[in-house]
């Protein structure tokens, strides 16, 4: 299996070590969670994997190749997709145009652009809003468009930053199902989100971060039962089911 790995990376911001020593890995065909309280270093870790931030120490490896110094766009070309928490749809373009625009930027020929767009519209159940402008979409519809655009670039791995934020409970379940479909397609998916239960329910394993380090790693149930995870992050009354 191809693997994307981040090994013992560190990052310092304004003389404060935000990420102290983090080692994690992800393989194709699995869903992995990266969770923790505010200020734990999750976002910075995400940024170092995607290339937004360069670590002060350590390496980022992709399929056996070091990519620590590669810019974000080159990592994307290798197959590393990233979906930020902030809304990224083009508000004044239709759903169809949103998807086609990404394909245009990659130099895909027109006939192939149209075919790919139509397939993604159908796969992500966006036919009813295909002609709608980005600003008119609900939170769940917007997320589906953003994921469809990310998939259009044929990544091997996707990093999802707060995919459940700003969507209603029904849409959360919808996005969970989409993530499982992506897994079935063989993609590796790394998720960070404050919706702990929703994340742990769809991950094979997860990492809990606190104060810039990995506190615990394991399955959702192992983490839910861990005393340290409960004390630092989950709370004594946390239950996965």
Language model: regions and residue ranges:
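Single conserved hydrophobic/aromatic residue that forms the stacking wall/gate
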Residues: 1-5, 9
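The feature captures the beta-strand-to-loop junction immediately N-terminal to the Walker
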Residues: 35-37
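Helix-to-loop junction immediately C-terminal to a conserved catalytic motif
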Residues: 50
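Conserved ABC transporter NBD signature motif
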Residues: 58-65, 78, 116
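Conserved ABC ATPase "signature" region
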Residues: 111-129, 176-180
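Conserved ABC ATPase signature
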Residues: 133-137, 141
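Catalytic Walker B motif of ABC-type/P-loop ATPase nucleotide-binding domains
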Residues: 158-162
């Amino acid at each position: 299996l191809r693997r994307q790995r981040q090994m013992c990376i560190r990052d310092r911001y304004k003389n404060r070590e935000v990420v102290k020593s983090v080692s994690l890995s992800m393989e194709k065909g699995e869903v992995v969670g990266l969770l923790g309280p505010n200020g734990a270093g999750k976002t910075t870790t995400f940024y170092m994997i995607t290339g937004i931030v360069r670590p002060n120490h350590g390496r980022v490896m992709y399929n056996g190749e070091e990519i620590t110094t590669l810019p974000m766009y080159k990592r994307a070309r290798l197959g590393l997709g990233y979906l930020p928490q902030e809304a990224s749809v083009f508000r004044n373009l239709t759903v169809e145009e949103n998807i086609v625009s990404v394909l245009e930027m990659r130099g895909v020929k027109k006939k192939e652009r149209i075919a790919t767009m139509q397939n993604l519209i159908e796969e992500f159940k966006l036919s009813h809003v295909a002609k709608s402008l980005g600003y008119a979409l609900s939170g769940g519809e917007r997320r589906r468009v953003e994921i469809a655009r990310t998939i259009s670039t044929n990544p091997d791995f996707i990093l999802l930053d707060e995919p459940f934020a700003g969507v209603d409970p029904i849409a959360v379940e919808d996005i969970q199902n989409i993530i499982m479909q992506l897994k079935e397609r063989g993609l590796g998916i790394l998720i960070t989100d404050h919706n702990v239960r929703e994340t742990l329910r769809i991950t094979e394993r997860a990492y809990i971060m606190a104060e810039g380090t990995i506190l615990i790693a394991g399955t959702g149930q192992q983490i839910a039962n861990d005393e340290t995870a409960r004390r630092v992050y989950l709370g004594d009354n946390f239950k996965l089911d």
